[in-house]
Design a protein with these regions (language model features):
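Polytopic alpha-helical membrane-helix bundles and their juxtamembrane interface segments
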Residues: 2-249
Length: 249
């Protein structure tokens, strides 16, 4: 879990602004128009990710910050009604998250790599059981990603208009499922939770757009989206995460 002692005041301030702007997004437009210019009302969706992007320049790893920036651009394109642009920028965001997870795993200290797959292995058990635990984690991650990708390809993609949009959706589905699988390989529950919320948001959005209307879709999509992004960002900026994790292995 996230160690609150590793979160500084700048991060707390960032989260406060993020939550405030997220609440503003859900305020009805007629109410907002009484106090804000029309352009601010139209593009208010970008506020929370703009906050994470700007703060991330100083607080977060570079790849995570790039993921937030591309997500911000995706939000802007969505508000502007450009679905292809929206999908393209979010695909880039997932590519950055994939790179972040790969880099993070490859650069873990050797002692943490040694202990992270021994967590479920009893003391004194043969070392090969740790290898089996690692293999099981990889298999479970790949299976989950494959199942979700199969669901997207069979239940959603056939309803997408043929052509560039459908091709883009297939590529996007592969990227986001890969991102989820890699988040699970981190063996850090919050990374996996954030990625899962992000994916759930996209499933609801695509189902609502291409298959059939989803009740309360705005709230289901945006609450899970904002929550997932915030969890990913917060987990990435936590100080001394590797040291804390290794001490608890």
């Amino acid at each position: 879990m996230l160690n609150m002692k590793n979160i500084d005041r700048k991060v707390v301030a960032t989260v406060a602004v993020f939550l405030l702007l997220a609440v503003v997004y859900f305020i009805p437009k007629p109410v907002l128009r009484m106090a804000l210019p029309e352009i601010v009302v139209k593009y208010r969706i970008v506020g929370p990710l703009l906050t994470l992007s700007l703060a991330g320049i100083f607080l977060a790893p570079r790849l995570m910050t790039l993921a937030m920036i591309f997500s911000l651009c995706g939000d802007y394109m969505g508000a502007a009604g450009n679905f292809i642009g929206q999908m393209s920028f979010f695909a880039a965001a997932h590519a950055m998250l994939i790179a972040f997870f790969v880099q993070r795993f490859r650069t873990l200290p050797a002692d943490l790599q040694a202990c992270r797959y021994q967590e479920s292995v009893p003391d004194g058990a043969p070392a090969r059981k740790g290898v089996r635990a690692k293999a099981l984690t990889v298999i479970c991650s790949a299976t989950a990603a494959a199942a979700l990708l199969t669901f997207a390809l069979t239940c959603i993609i056939p309803h997408v208009p043929a052509g560039v949009t459908r091709i883009g959706c297939v590529i996007y589905a592969v990227l986001i499922c890969s991102m989820l699988a890699l988040s699970m390989l981190q063996r850090h529950g919050l990374f996996a939770l954030g990625a899962a919320l992000f994916l759930f948001s996209d499933i609801i959005l695509s189902w609502h757009r291409f298959v059939s209307p989803v009740p309360y879709s705005k709230y289901l999509i945006m609450i899970t989206y904002y929550s997932g992004q915030l969890i990913l960002w917060l987990t990435a900026v936590a100080k001394d995460e590797y040291k804390t994790r290794c001490q608890t292995c």
